[in-house]
Amino acid sequence: MGEEYDSVEDISGALLLHVEGYGDVRLSDVADVEVIDNSADSYTRLNGEKASILKIYKNATSSAGEVSDNCLTAFEQMESRYDGLHMVVLSNQGNYITIVIQSILTSMVVGAALAIIVLAIFLKDVKPTLVVGISIPLSVLFAVVLMYFTGLDLNVMTLAGLSLGIGMLVDNSVVVIENIYRLRSRGVPAARAAVQGTRQVGMSVVASTLTSVCVFLPVVFSASLVRSLMMPMSLCIGYCLMASLIVALTVVPAAASTVLKKAEPKRLVWFEKVQEKYAHSLEWCLQHRALPLIAAVVLLVFSGWQVLNMGVELLPSITSNEAQITLSTADGLTKEESYAIAGQVAEAALNVENVEEVGITTDTSMAGLDISQLGLPTAITDILNSANAYGRYKINVMMSKSLSSREVEKTRQAMEDAVSQIENCTAEVKLYGMTDDLTSQLATGLSVKVYGKDPETLTTVSEKVMEIVNDTEGFANADNGLGSGDATIILKVDRDKVRAYGLTVAQVYQQIAAKLTTTATAQTPVTVNGTTMDVQITDNLDPVTKENMMELTFETTEMSADGTVTNGTCTLNDIASWTTGTAPDAITSENQTEFVTVTADTLKGYNTMVQSRVLQKKLDEYAASGEMPEGCSTTLGGETEGTDYMVNEMVQWMALALPFVYLVMVAQFQSLLSPFIVLFTVPLAFTGGLLGLLVTGQQLTMISLMGFIVLMGTVVNNGIVFVDYANQLRIGGMERRAALVATGKTRMRPILMTTLTTVLAMLQLVFSGDMASQLMSGMAIVIICGLSYATLMTLYIVPVLYDILFKKPPLNVDVGSDDDLDDIPDDAAEFIAAQKSAGTAQPEA
């Protein structure tokens, strides 16, 4: 074997050995060699015509998109080379990735454009807008270079990180250019405004960036699943932020000192009116401090409770124009009858409107494994296939690419209605999404493990659990996997007789197993005239049957009463008996305890986690009622187990990130109290994010939880800038509440600008409706609503907390001097002078 032959006759004439006095013994002398057409062993059709289905897998180091493009090119070349060859792609994961990447790139461009528009509106000047606009491509280029040197590829998760970074990376540049522009409007020369404006907010910008970056540090402590999903995105966001910090502290002031030399800052009359109204509302909040705090806490509790009742899921479902029909024909049908029904189902699906391609093939998987990939001898593979494949089919459906998500669902429902009319079969029609492969590994859907001592008890208890599951609203089609059992030959070994013959049960088992596995050896294929074929060796002289298996001979050792040892033989018939029956094939063992898994489908419109809480109460009642046999127990698994695992990992991530954020702010403020005030904006952001999910009907997922982690680092930025500037004004001699109102009016513009640039950059991911939106919309909604709500609250709650906690006046007063270029222009002195001229100066509280 392993050689190449020109024909079957060459194989038949292969020399086996030479016998003296007889001559050469060739293969044809002891065996018949023939080529058998086994195409009927599987059923494969494309749009009703005979076909072959190929599955192509990429290796671990290759890009799915690149492999997909190369395969499509190769298909076109083969179609042009061979007449009559027609190749149709029924499923292409590389296509999903390409679509998502293109969508995210579009979001990046749109987000950058919207950010520049926001700057133009607030600054009312093209020059500072262009300065910030330059920082966007520079920061992205810097981030991409860092990605290259750290070995990160451009994929869905890294581009999602860049897309998030687009809205965030202009924040630092906006704060710097706005402060420079503000000083320039006071008549400060361009060079001095660039230096002093950058120094005035420099430490705040550094602290803000570090808080945004440090929230991603705990990802290295996460379990492999969370780390593998979130590490690329986290690194990309971190690279963007660090790049934006460097650009904001170097390129932006350098460009501003040149561009703004002849600039004449323009007044924003409409915004000045907004500032005055905000100042009056802030003064009212400072006089009624309890009301805004109570409102913030009530909203946080309400939103959290409502979202948890909505449920949690692992990953958002991403629908595409592909569907898969899992078909099972009734038991007792012949192969031809089963094939005919499968053809009817495929034809019914093809006749549905908007369906373009339908491919069907026999399903050779068993218990989640592909039998053909197990490396078993061909004869055993054929036996398993014959018991498994005839009657089980997978049908891949390709719908029109122009369909919307709603139209795709309508087409799926139409296919389900069409195939349900066909008798003697059961079919399930599911849409195929990009996250399906991952979620299938995480065991989605309902799963209940039933533990017990023996198969009979497990069967009884699992049937009761199935009844409870089916009675629970939101669940249907409960199954314990036992069914009616497969037809099985049950061999009962008499242990006493085995010991009497000097044997052990293990010896009997090993010899039976050896007999069953030596009937086929087909590990090496042969090549005949350029065609590679598998080899099937069948021993027709000694076939395996129930009868001749019972005549299997064992060597025995018997000892008489006087100690004499006698060697002999016995047959399997002497020590065992056989019967036919059924045996369950789904009872498995865990920690030496047998269990059965009960699974069920979650109906559309219901959440597995929410309904699992109801089911858990019913299972607890069943266990407490005394009906459950002693030694039996139940645990929820599947999506419930996977979601609990994911939520715990993400909560631990948040818990670890919070101290990092606090420590960075302690270093910035050199105070333990100031960071606490800023840290209060984190639950405010959570309130906004939770309310956003509640209003839009989105569920908590791993992706949306990532949005909350991003918020932890970003929402404190505005608080840092606010508190830092308020401290500067109080050190300059201003009264506490006057400093807070002045800070709010002064920092309102950069706070709103940074918020709007981030929010507008995220909007494309929410409203585009494409595959990237389906994947990232949850996180985008959390960031948009959380940041918007937290920004509004920062302008009110942070001043209120500052007013409550900072009772003591500042110890050091530094009014500064305008003679030294390195001295910061004294904003506090200017505000105090304005108050005196208006007659509103107040003593320090």
Where do the model's predicted regions map?
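Extracytoplasmic/periplasmic
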Residues: 313-396, 417, 455-488, 836
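Extracytoplasmic/periplasmic membrane-proximal domains and adjacent transmembrane bundles
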Residues: 1-113, 120, 177, 428, ...
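Helix-loop junctions and hydrophobic alpha-helical segments within the transmembrane domains
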Residues: 97, 101, 177, 182-210, ...
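Signature of alpha-helical transmembrane segments and their immediate interfacial
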Residues: 201, 267-316, 448, 825-835, ...
